[in-house]
Design a protein with these regions (language model features):
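An extended, acidic
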Residues: 13, 157-162, 166-348
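Generic detector of contiguous secondary-structure segments
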Residues: 26-49, 132-140, 239-258, 278-279
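DPxDG-like acidic metal-binding loop motif
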Residues: 99-106, 114-184
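Residues embedded in well-ordered beta-strands
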Residues: 4, 57, 118, 139-141, ...
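N-terminal subdomain of lithium-sensitive/metallo-dependent phosphomonoesterases centered on the IMPase/IPPase/PAP
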Residues: 1-124, 157-160, 192-195, 232-235, ...
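Residue-level marker of motif borders
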Residues: 31, 117-120, 150, 275, ...
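Buried hydrophobic packing segments
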Residues: 43, 142, 284-288
Length: 348
């Protein structure tokens, strides 16, 4: 199952088109590109084709609404060309019409929930990073009775070597990682293009950092200030005695990098009112958990993927190894308390 997902998703082909494409704006002002739509259409089309016997349910980020407007003909045409080129290079004879593309995108309209099986797709996670030429990920997971049982994370711009090393060794030039995990079977990483790498000729099992002293830990957070509260993560890091500056990268590549021990902690504290979506965390969550991490909200509760499209959680998402989690949780809760009731100065 995982194997055919690997061979079909070729994000680098999509990336080339992205560089020439217009970036559209969704109704919530967030960006979406032909690559987001193309990736969703492709993954949805292939999954449905490969799983004919199963009742197919896909919860995916994008929908075809804006593409059906009169002004979107050109963009739709580009997505169609991109998809047909990719299918042709994969030996597929069928040429898809514009309507086929829209239908494939809209296959991702399922609401998910606690019953049965649902695929969960973020066709391009970290679109802002993608547009900037930074990190992004293609994230696919499978829910079974509300639990994530499989996750695949393609990170086309992530170096195969650890990003913890600041010296730009030659292996930093080799980019493109594929992480995958199935429940109870660990997490594996291989090069995205299938080429051999001296460290990972085929696939290697990866593990999170075993650091026990928080002063030696480094932490990941979003690149985008709008996606997390830097002042809060700064306060948590100070309480833990973390010396290294934060590593700010886009997308679920953070979960992938964490799963192989490039850093020890991931902190995500969205601003008030933001509701996290399952496709932003499902694949990353199983990839990092199967590598030995604990993922929880600020109350210490595991993420619940059974509630539909949204994660219903108490403030924030935190990830680290089992040893560090109790210390991290205390630092998080102390910092949140202080942020909600800042200490008052002495009265005059
Ligand atoms: N205000 C906000 N707070 C937290 N996350 C947000 C946000 N606005 C958008 N996001 C989500 O953050 C994701 C990117 O996360 P990161 O900051 O780790 O790169 C986006 O995924 P997409 O790029 O798939 O839309 C989007 O779903
Ligand atoms: Mg988006
Ligand atoms: Mg996303
Ligand atoms: Mg996305």
């Amino acid at each position: 199952m995982v194997e055919w997902v690997h061979t079909r998703i070729h994000p680098k082909k999509v990336q080339k088109v992205l560089l020439q494409s217009d970036v559209q704006s969704k109704s919530d002002k967030s960006p979406v590109t032909v690559a987001d739509y193309g990736s969703q259409a492709l993954v949805s089309y292939i999954l449905e084709k490969e799983l004919p016997s199963e009742s197919f349910s896909l919860v995916a980020e994008e929908d075809s609404g804006d593409l059906r407007n009169d002004g979107s003909q050109e963009v739709l045409q580009r997505i169609r060309e991109l998809m047909n080129d990719t299918l042709a290079s994969d030996g597929e004879n069928k040429v898809l019409s514009a309507e086929d593309v829209l239908t494939a995108i809209d296959s991702g309209k399922s609401e998910g929930g606690p019953l049965g099986r649902h695929w969960v797709l973020d066709p391009i996670d970290g679109t802002k990073g993608f547009v900037r030429g930074h990190q992004y990920a293609i994230a696919l997971a499978l829910l079974d009775e509300g639990k994530v049982v499989l996750g695949v994370l393609g990170c086309p711009n992530l170096p195969l070597a650890s990003i913890a090393n600041t010296d730009q060794s030659s292996s930093q030039n080799q980019v493109g990682c594929l992480f995958y995990a199935t429940i109870g079977s660990g997490t594996y990483m291989q090069s995205l293009d299938g080429s051999s790498h001296k460290k990972s000729p085929v696939a290697i099992q990866v593990h999170v950092s075993a650091i026990e002293n928080p002063a030696e830990a480094s932490f990941f957070e979003s690149f985008e200030a709008a996606h997390t509260t830097f002042s809060l993560s700064g306060s948590i890091a100070t309480k833990l005695g973390v010396k290294a500056p934060p590593v700010r990268i886009d997308s679920q590549a953070k979960y992938g990098a964490l799963s192989r021990g490039d850093g020890a902690i991931y902190l995500r504290f969205p601003h008030k009112g933001y509701r996290e979506k399952i496709w932003d965390h499902a694949a990353g969550c199983i990839v990092v958990t199967e590598a030995g991490a604990v993922v929880s909200d600020a109350a210490g509760k595991p993420l619940d993927f059974s509630k539909g499209k949204f994660l219903d959680l108490d403030t924030g998402i935190i990830v680290t190894n089992q040893k560090l989690m109790p210390l991290l949780l205390k630092a998080v809760q102390d910092s949140l308390r202080e942020a909600s009731s800042p200490p008052t100065g002495p009265s005059l």
